[in-house]
């Protein structure tokens, strides 16, 4: 039976503008049959095989070719939700290969690779209030907890929690710790656990490791009901080469470049050929799929620099640049309240500027330069830090050139790079003090915040995707307990103080940045309200200061310590009343008055002006 052609859908698909391709392609159950559609431009024939025909194509299982550009379609009776299937594709030279459905909504658990007839999930959402109030968050606190679902926490028998179970555990923990968003590492279906999801192939199929599409909808809905946002890690640049997937889908370079110099990358995966309109529709539609069907609040696009440049790292990929601009603009037209975040390690300009101004149109960009420079500085013994002072101050030179997120991500605690704790110099107690200083500096620096799971209680080991976090440290290790308490207090301070998340260029002002010998750094974070500001003071040296003078903006009133990383309750040495300082009428740091504060070695102090 030849079905209606769907000419508008085909037209948009071949133009690279089909936002709802997933509603046309893939497997779509009806009351008595299932309709299959697939794009395989170089195939001689296409059939659907599965558990319903013992994986042998019958005459009625063969597809009809709808367009010269390679859209195939068939309606098969008595196939229902839950049936396994693949496409049997005959290549141009006559070989028959089996492929999973690129548009499948659900897939078998690895190592099995069949697609599962599922249809679009019918979930009863209860997050209307959240969606109605959702916005990008330029002028709001954004404090992201980056999570790998398979290794955050496991059951006692070592198996995974499903999406529903882990949602409730994560929400309780994140609310307690004062985070605002979760960022989930990729959950498209992927064959190899060790790729962490970054080498996937089932772009429309939420990984079955942790449950069903309905389960994941429950996950997002539960977060929204508890006023927490959900950001999804998405990989639009490359995909795995496993034989059942997108690679050489119809025997030819279908989704990837034919030329290996364009199609290969450092990870051994294949780059999407976004100069091809049908590939553009596949990715454009996939972005809409996650946002429309799963109510995702933000998309973090992985490895954007791999898209912007060819393999040599020098030649610009103009097709990718144009595609990213189109992708971001299209999405913002329909979903202006969804965050688009670039993980870009290059120096490409205007990443978060409008397309009309030559920008790529992202809302935020990971500040990889800040992360690398800051960690290199913190790894130095305090005695040698004065030779590296510029690594702390340089990021302020470009802090407002883009809308930045400051990441301390999973990439920095794997492959021999050490955990955050063990990057720090000195004995254990010294390391803990350095970690608190690092986190304080991140929180005070202009930009939104992101931390990888486990950073908040300083795991000793690097992250291992196959094991849960070292939760036992919170039972028997005082250092981990102290750091977790401090991160909780720091996150709370960030949420409550607009001066820390108001990221306009007028929201920052230096007080002292040239005291290289003392390893001191002092600056203001402020709001447009002249009296609403916080002074952040950092002592990155190994020297205590009983009296340290610093210039302040206003003469009247008091300057109260609202957080001190050296407090006893956080594992420090200071125990006493909250300190308040009155200004002294004398010029200091180019200001007409100053205060004298006490600050311990390797510590941070936050002061708030009280009239």
UniProtKB/Swiss-Prot annotation:
Pathway note: Glycan biosynthesis; glycogen biosynthesis
Keyword list, A-Z: Carbohydrate metabolism, Glycogen biosynthesis, Glycogen metabolism, Glycosyltransferase, Transferase
UniProt-listed InterPro entries: A-amylase/branching_C, Branching_enzy, GlgB, GlgB_N_E_set_prok, Glyco_hydro_13_cat_dom, Glyco_hydro_13_N, Glyco_hydro_b, Glycoside_hydrolase_SF
Alphabetized Pfam families for the sequence: Alpha-amylase, Alpha-amylase_C, CBM_48
GO-annotated molecular function: 1,4-alpha-glucan branching enzyme activity; cation binding; hydrolase activity, hydrolyzing O-glycosyl compounds
Catalytic activity: Transfers a segment of a (1->4)-alpha-D-glucan chain to a primary hydroxy group in a similar glucan chain
Residue numbers annotated as active site: 302, 343
Enzyme nomenclature, EC number: 2.4.1.18
GO biological process, any: glycogen biosynthetic process
CDD domains: AmyAc_Glg_BE (cd11322), E_set_GBE_prok_N (cd02855)
GO CC list: cytoplasm; cytosol
Function: Catalyzes the formation of the alpha-1,6-glucosidic linkages in glycogen by scission of a 1,4-alpha-linked oligosaccharide from growing alpha-1,4-glucan chains and the subsequent attachment of the oligosaccharide to the alpha-1,6 position.
NCBIfam families the record matches: branching_enzym (TIGR01515), PRK05402.1 (NF003811), PRK12313.1 (NF008967)
Quaternary structure, from the entry: Monomer.
Record-stated family: Belongs to the glycosyl hydrolase 13 family. GlgB subfamily.
Name this protein carries in UniProt: 1,4-alpha-glucan branching enzyme GlgB
Organism, as annotated: Fusobacterium nucleatum subsp. nucleatum (strain ATCC 25586 / DSM 15643 / BCRC 10681 / CIP 101130 / JCM 8532 / KCTC 2640 / LMG 13131 / VPI 4355)
Gene that produces this protein: glgB
């Amino acid at each position: 039976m030849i079905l209606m052609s769907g000419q508008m859908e085909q037209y948009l698909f071949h133009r690279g503008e089909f936002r709802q391709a997933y509603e046309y392609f893939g497997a779509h159950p009806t009351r008595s049959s299932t309709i299959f559609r697939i794009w395989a431009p170089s195939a001689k024939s296409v059939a659907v095989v599965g558990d319903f025909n013992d994986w042998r194509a019958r005459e009625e299982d063969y597809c009809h070719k709808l367009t010269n550009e390679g859209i195939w379609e068939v309606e098969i009776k008595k196939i229902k939700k839950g049936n396994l299937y693949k496409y049997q594709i005959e290549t141009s030279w006559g070989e028959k290969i089996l492929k999973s459905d690129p548009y499948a909504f659900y897939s078998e658990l690895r190592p099995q690779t069949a697609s599962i007839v599922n249809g679009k999930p019918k979930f009863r959402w209860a997050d209307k209030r959240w969606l109605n109030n959702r916005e990008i968050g330029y002028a709001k606190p954004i404090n992201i907890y980056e999570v790998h679902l398979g290794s955050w926490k496991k059951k006692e028998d070592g198996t995974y929690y499903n999406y529903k179970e882990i949602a409730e555990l994560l929400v309780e923990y994140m609310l307690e710790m004062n985070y605002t968003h979760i960022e989930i590492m990729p959950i498209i279906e992927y064959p190899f656990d060790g790729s962490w999801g970054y080498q996937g192939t089932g772009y429309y199929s939420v990984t079955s490791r942790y449950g069903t599409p309905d389960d994941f909808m429950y996950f997002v809905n539960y977060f929204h009901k508890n006023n927490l946002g959900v950001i999804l890690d998405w990989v639009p640049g490359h995909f795995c080469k496993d034989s059942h997937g997108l690679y050489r889908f119809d025997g030819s370079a279908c989704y990837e470049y034919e030329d290996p110099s364009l199609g290969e990358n450092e990870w051994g995966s294949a780059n999407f050929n976004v100069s091809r309109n049908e590939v553009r529709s596949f990715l454009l539609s996939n972005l809409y799929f996650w946002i429309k069907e799963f109510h995702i609040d933000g998309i973090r696009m992985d490895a954007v620099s791999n898209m912007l440049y060819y393999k040599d790292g020098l030649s610009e990929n103009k097709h990718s640049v144009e595609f990213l601009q189109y992708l971001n603009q299209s999405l913002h037209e329909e979903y202006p309240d969804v965050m688009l975040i670039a993980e870009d390690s290059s120096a490409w300009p205007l990443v978060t500027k409008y397309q009309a101004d030559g920008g790529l149109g992202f809302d935020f960009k990971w500040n990889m330069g800040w992360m690398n420079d800051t960690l290199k500085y913190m790894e130095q013994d305090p005695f040698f830090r004065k030779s590296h002072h510029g690594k702390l101050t340089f990021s302020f030179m470009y802090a407002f050139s883009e809308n930045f997120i400051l990441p301390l991500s999973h990439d920095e605690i794997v492959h021999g790079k050490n955990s955050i704790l063990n990057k720090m110099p000195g004995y254990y107690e010294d390391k803990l003090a350095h970690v608190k200083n690092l986190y304080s500096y991140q929180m005070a620096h202009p930009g939104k915040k992101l931390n990888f799971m486990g950073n908040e209680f300083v795991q000793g080991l690097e992250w291992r995707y196959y094991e849960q976090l070292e939760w036992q440290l919170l039972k028997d290790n005082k250092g981990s307990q102290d750091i977790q308490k401090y991160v909780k207090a720091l996150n709370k301070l960030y949420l409550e103080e607009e001066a820390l998340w108001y990221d306009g260029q007028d929201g920052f002002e230096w007080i002292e940045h040239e005291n290289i010998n003392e390893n001191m750094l002092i600056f203001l974070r402020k709001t447009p309200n002249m009296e609403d500001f916080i002074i952040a003071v950092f002592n990155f040296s190994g020297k205590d200061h009983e009296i340290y003078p610093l210039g302040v903006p206003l003469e009247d009133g008091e300057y109260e310590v609202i957080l001190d990383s050296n407090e006893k309750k956080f594992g420090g040495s200071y125990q006493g009343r909250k300190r308040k300082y009155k200004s002294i009428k004398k010029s200091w740091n180019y200001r007409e008055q100053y205060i004298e504060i006490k600050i311990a070695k390797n510590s941070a102090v936050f002061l708030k002006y009280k009239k």
